[in-house]
Amino acid sequence: MCGIVGAIAERNITPILIEGLKRLEYRGYDSAGVAVFDNEGRLQRCRRVGKVASLEEGLAGTPLLGRLGIAHTRWATHGAPTEGNAHPHFSSDEVAVVHNGIIENHEPLRERLKGLGYVFTSQTDTEVIVHLLHHKLQSIGDLTLALKDAVKELHGAYGLAVISAAQPDRIVAARSGSPLVIGLGLGENFLASDQLALRQVTDRFIYLEEGDIAEIRRDSVRLWDVQGNDVQRETVQYHEGAEAADKGEYRHFMLKEIHEQPSVVQRTLEGRLGQNQVLVESFGPQAAELFAKVRNVQIVACGTSYHAGMVARYWLESLTGIPCQVEVASEFRYRKVAVQPDCLFVTISQSGETADTLAALRNAKELGFLSSVAICNVATSSLVRESDLTLLTQAGPEIGVASTKAFTTQLVALLLLTLGIGQVQKRLADGVEAELVDELRRLPTRLGEALAMNRTVEKVSELFAEKHHTLFLGRGAQFPVALEGALKLKEISYIHAEAYPAGELKHGPLALVDSDMPVVTVAPNNELVEKLKSNLQEVRARGGELVVFADEGAGIEAGEGTHVVGMPHIGDVLSPILYTIPLQLLSYHVAVLKGTDVDQPRNLAKSVTVE
């Protein structure tokens, strides 16, 4: 959600901090700030509500020059988005803190610190941290030791960075439930909540693990684990080009990422398909042994990843006969779970840092699940490190808040998982795996054909320019696709959108249908298409306007109030992946017509690292 950047160097670090914040804008935020230990030996800061550009304007009038500093983009959790609530927070102009996460016991700590004479100027939980650190420093005298002592009193999730005027030779940092990464330079070092913020200055990174404390100086880095032991963490070199953070020829990152889907799906498949079968060892050397034991599957995820899991349930049960449950992580983690025998626990997350999904995985380890598999896009993420097996999607960095290419690559990975389990247990019908492997090889081409309909979808989007409500319908494995389509539309166009199984139309949603409520549906040519046609007739009978993305063989014809976009033919199993594409394009073009911020929609964050 929020973003952290820190730097210590022999040069002016303010431009580095600002550029880092710009690279984190995709995560979503409502205010930004920077604090620098200036060349006169003072801690100075600048904070602004709104975009990083507003912060830049403030710095243009009053430049902050220094060799040590921290910066932050805030997404409000405690306290409104105001300048006073923006980070960094100060204590006595001597200590500055930036913080991602939520301190659950901030209220009793606040009252205690008030009793010690501290005056609070914000409504944030973060201000508790900076005053607590200042208090510890009075008796301890060393910033690193003070932080080690202070975190013992913090309950909740935090990734935080601290600088002090008393010790301007270091940044100290702590990670518990919110990611932090150190960037290594030559005679300079950096800190961020996401390596993307630092790629302009380094390609060498150290990822803090849960409970780690870090002391970052210009020419050294020291780490301590949760037990207080000196530790070394692996240095990871990043090789991917910086073009991922550049829109190139596209107007928005979202449109660029939609059009990248053929290539990222191709990359996700590379090295994972044999001549006629999925290569099970691509999940790891122990995968075959594990897959042989699976009798049940539990999938846990949030948002778009949850919709991917819902599609996987249809695949697992129809292709392998293995029962599968899918649950939202924020619900799973807080209920008493009855674990089925030999149950594989599967998590799905683009970032691998989604707070509820990580917490669910940690809970699962105590509940007796067979093993854990992560479907994730970030190799160095907490989810990957804490799971037994991983299948990495190869979507590359996804900048737009509304997920597109991450979703389709998750679906590909989940189908590979389904086929892998079915293969090992010999549960797949004769010829099915070879047929689906062949279709997977041709999938990037089919996705390209769907993207070629961009102009047609753009024309259809004009129907939504003055609409405020939309209904999405789907049957079978297309119902989660309808859910995803509704989510995309509401996320970026701010049109209220709901999705239902088409068979539920008469059980309530039909009451909403009129000429002002367009109904969007996807119609592959399968055994459910005739039933879907009946649902569409019910909509037209109530004056509802239909937008149908239909297989050429489905027999759905355009007419008054019925707008049909013909889709390339694809087998039923892979159709949820293909039919996602036009719904993404529709949402994008409607949002452009509405004039919304496509890449950074209001109130939303890319990576939800707090509850």
UniProtKB/Swiss-Prot annotation:
The keyword Transferase applies. Coiled coil: none annotated. GO terms for biological process: carbohydrate metabolic process; fructose 6-phosphate metabolic process; protein N-linked glycosylation; UDP-N-acetylglucosamine metabolic process. GO terms for cellular component: cytosol. Its main location: cytoplasm. The active site is at C2, K606. Residues 2-219 form the Glutamine amidotransferase type-2 domain. Catalyzes the first step in hexosamine metabolism, converting fructose-6P into glucosamine-6P using glutamine as a nitrogen source. Homodimer. This is Glutamine--fructose-6-phosphate aminotransferase [isomerizing]. It comes from Pseudomonas aeruginosa (strain ATCC 15692 / DSM 22644 / CIP 104116 / JCM 14847 / LMG 12228 / 1C / PRS 101 / PAO1).
